[in-house]
Amino acid sequence: MPIGPNILAQSKLPLTFEVINPGDIGIEPPENRIGDSLRTWVRSLSVFQKEAIVASSRTGLVWRLASDEGPYLDGHDEASCPLSFLTVGMIASYMNEIMALAKQQELVIRQIRLIQDNYYTMEGSMRKRTMVGGALPVELTVEIDCDLDDAALNALLLNAIAASPINGLMRGKLESLFALSKNSCQIELGKSKPIEGLLYGDPENKFDGYEAKGSALNEPIVEPVGVTPKKEIPGGTSAAGSSLADEQSRTLNIGGICTLREDGIKEITQLQYSPHGTSFKLLSEEAEVNGGQGRAPDANTYISAGVAFCFMTQFGRFVKMLDLDLKEYRVVQDSYFSLGGASGGTGQAGTAHPLETHVYLETNESDDVAREMLDISEQTCFLHAFCRTDMKTKLRVVRL
């Protein structure tokens, strides 16, 4: 049964929209180190409901996104889950690079559809502090109609995968960096690696000042499309509250299907196979500087929001499972990506810098418990595991 109020539904706001007054709320992207840098603010709204505000240095756009969990975490299922955002951003980025390489080679692609599966693991006991989140290799199927022979097509697709900026998170074995505030005072870290520099100011009271820009699309950017079809996943789960069990040995599978519409919008159906849940349709488009019109969030925005959402969920799980006090919690995350090797014209593989996350906790627990909240949340976060694990995307090609 859902816990807490359904704030996302009560707000009457779209789940995703462009913020037109970023200067008023004070969000600015970090310095642009290697191509694009994004600052992501996230706050908890109600148990597992969260909202993010993401600002990009390259595009100049600021987006608000929202996330929720389904019955497996006693959520309201009002918005797509945190892991879906990385899958959506990743498959959108792959489509960007494939189409850019095809354009460079003057290749006509008559039809294309991408099908992606992301897999994660959760093993151990929360009470024993042995629970660890993991990430497994990604599977990508490209359904395509074009005139390239098999060898040339395979080479193009592998080059596109490597050219994606997310390649830097997958292949870099990046250890994330952190800073921690408890009740408005910075405290020393436990096991986590520290950020060099000062703790950022807490965006505590700045979220409520944003204003939504009217959409240029005659449809929601995010909307539910029904229950995900069931498929057998070894170690998969579907029961209510299953993600809150103390002892776990489970496999998660988030899928995505991406098509490129005639209007230039990438339409992505997110599939929640395990834990089994609701499918959502999400739209993506690159900004004008990257060749699009910026009518929906770009790939880097979805990826950045996804990591921060997933990390925030682990705080919620930890304190709920151990009955700890955590009144409010927020993060400010900085992510740094290169331009795409094809879409950005670098001709190089995509790269990234380690994520830098500032954490703000309001709690009556001790400093040691606050440190443990951060350490366990990082330890159990699937997407921080994704960043520190060297993985390749497994490619399969289907001719249409």
Language model features: what each stretch is:
Residues 90-94, 310-311:
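Alpha-helical metal-binding/catalytic segments enriched in His/Glu/Asp
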